[in-house]
């Protein structure tokens, strides 16, 4: 949000410290390391959930179908290990969140599972937030998606292990 505000004529808002509170899940958290350390010792890192003082109602669509408007899939209990699927319910090729606030920009976030955590807080600054997971989306190229949906802001989110891979994430 700060980078968009500093480098463009588009102005985005994000809740200040008094308007957002983070809750820490007590569960063991694998996070983005899941694919590399499955079954190995957990560290002390904890998953955080953003709670906005003034929640914004929204509609959610996953892969073109209207979905339940949730941001977090709560774990069964405090001891079950949690990972990135807790954010946004996991990976979808395309998620669209509509807040119906025309004064805010339409934003496209593309990348891989790292987008899931960002989506849970980014939507509040958007009229529409589109998220494309390049590993699972194949309906059209990223360029065609941008031409069709005309977002005001486009943000790419990748981890260093995938950005130079010419398959999946790197092919776009």
Predicted regions and their residues:
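Extracellular glycan-modifying ectodomains
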Residues: 1-172
């Amino acid at each position: 949000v700060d980078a968009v505000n500093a480098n463009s004529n588009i102005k985005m808002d994000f809740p200040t410290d008094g308007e957002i509170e983070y809750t820490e899940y007590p569960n063991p958290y694998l996070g983005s390391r899941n694919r590399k350390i499955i079954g190995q010792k957990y560290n002390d890192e904890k998953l955080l959930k953003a709670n906005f003082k003034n929640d914004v109602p929204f509609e959610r669509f996953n892969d073109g179908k209207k979905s339940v408007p949730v941001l977090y899939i709560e774990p069964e209990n405090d001891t079950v290990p949690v990972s990135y699927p807790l954010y946004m319910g996991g990976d979808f090729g395309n998620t669209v969140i509509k807040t119906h606030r025309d004064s805010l920009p339409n934003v496209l976030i593309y990348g891989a599972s790292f987008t899931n955590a960002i989506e849970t807080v980014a939507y509040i600054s958007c009229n529409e937030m589109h998220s494309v997971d390049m590993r699972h989306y194949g309906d059209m190229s990223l360029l065609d998606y941008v031409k069709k949906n005309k977002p005001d802001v486009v943000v790419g989110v990748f981890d260093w292990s995938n950005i130079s891979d010419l398959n999946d994430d790197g092919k776009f």
